[in-house]
Amino acid sequence: GGRALGATAYVTLEPCAHHGQTPPCADALIAAGVARVVCALGDPDPRVAGRGLARMQAAGIEVTVGPGAAQAAWDQAGFLSRINRMRPMVTLKLANSVDGRIATASGESRWITGPVARRAVHGLRLSHDALMVGGGTARADDPMLDVRGLGDVAQPVRVVLSAGLNLPLDGRLARTAGQVPLWLVHGPGAVTAPWQALGARCFEVPMLNPVPVLAALGAAGLTRVLCEGGGALAASLLRAGVVDRLIVFTAGLALGAEGRSCLADLGVKRLGEAARFKLHRVTEMDGDVRAEWILPPEMGAAGH
């Protein structure tokens, strides 16, 4: 409006200079008559990549880039990952006992963590574009994979990895495929018609390796994916070096060696072979502990 004339605009990301679903943001700022734009980050998208800044400067707008860059990069990590690495940012969530178990030997797991931690998981889900599980978890747990208890919110996409799509067509995921987005990533030869008839979107990849799976999800527009299990999928993501953030909810009980581990075999023979995450934040949650870890860029899989 008129009050923008001569004002300073603060933006997280460089205003775009191309026509997408809306006209270029740089043009809108020029038309509004702002005198100065303070931008935390340049936009690495090849369609922008400095063009927005140059267009505003050519129009006589003073442009400053950099203030708040670290926080902006943290907040925009998913977008930056999809542009720079051609895959979404991956968060791995684990909820386990102090000795790394997710269930007793008999399979009992409800509930290891308390209600405060479980509510926090729903907030974590809401901060991601998609929730991802393996086919084994989908078959064993019949999960809904949704956000509950936080009001009427836009539900994340539910992603299930299953080479042959041998998933129950009468399960909760199938029954709600028309209401909450369900994406199925599968291998060659899987029968997709029954799932597509239910409203699911199917993606074929040569193999259920994290690299092609995440590339397909990134190409489909996802920027932030939260993996919630099971142990085999979690281990495969860690082995591939594609876990960017690791969030572990730990309860104050021990289940022993006979309990079910939160991870499958990682193939680690020497300490130097294990990815070493950096602690970002620890939060006490009414008797449980939430620890957030980040993988330094030099520890990730090159090119992934």
Region locations from a protein language model:
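Residues at the N-termini of beta-strands
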Residues: R36-V37, A130, R224, D244-R245
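Short, acidic/turn-prone active-site loops that include or flank metal/cofactor-
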Residues: L41-D45, G68, A163-L165, G187-G189, ...
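Helical hairpin unit composed of two closely spaced alpha helices linked by a short loop
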Residues: L222-V225, G229, A234, R239-A240, ...
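Flexible, gly/pro- and Lys/Arg-enriched active-site loops
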Residues: R239-F277
